[in-house]
Amino acid sequence: MYKIEWQPKAYRQLNKIAEKKTKISILDAVDTLVNWPNCKQVKSLKNRNGYRIRVGRWRVLFDVAKKLKILKIEEVKKRDERTY
């Protein structure tokens, strides 16, 4: 099992989301990442290192330290042209 670490930037972005239902959905999706690499809806990013998971219109961008078994949640963004 992997440990999940929230970067300060990602934590601030999550707290700025107004809808409580959306926050809960994002937290539930992040909790499924502890079973890495057996996770659904995870895709590798093409233009930079890391991965993303889709939660409705939101994207959670993260990186994996495989040797340390740590997932670093780097950003939580609403999907638009500038997301990736």
PLM feature segments, named:
Residues L14-I17, L45:
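Alpha-helix C-terminal capping segments
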Residues M1-E5, K9, N15-K16, K23-I24, ...:
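Enriched for short, Lys/Arg-rich terminal
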Residues K16-K23, N35, C39:
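Alpha-helix boundary/capping and short turn/kink residues
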Residues A29-I53, T83-Y84:
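A short, surface-exposed loop/turn module that caps and links secondary-structure elements
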